[in-house]
Amino acid sequence: MRAWTTVEAGERLLLLRSCCAADAEFASPQGVTRGLEAFSGSIGAFLRSFPRAEVVAGPPDAHNGYVRVRWHTRFNDGATNPIFGDDFIEFDGDMRIRRVVSFDGSAADA
């Protein structure tokens, strides 16, 4: 989750390389990316769109090589419309992230 709060692109890419397969896929309502540079770019786009947002993750729920993480944003400027979501994470045989499928919505959707 640290990658989701890391603004500097080079540092974020290093974080992703430490835990993800080189061909990791990230699928969200905004589209699908493949590869760590594209994954990092998607995170960077999120951080640029919501510069005062902190992503807060709940405890992971895991079974059979899959993990679900529920998360929400917290805005340090007092904004009252957080984003809520669920990420479903698949690991490869080396326990590196192979795929993240993200579902998100506003508090009004929850």
List each model region and its residues.
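Soluble or luminal CAZymes and related metallo-dependent hydrolases
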Residues: 8, 38, 81
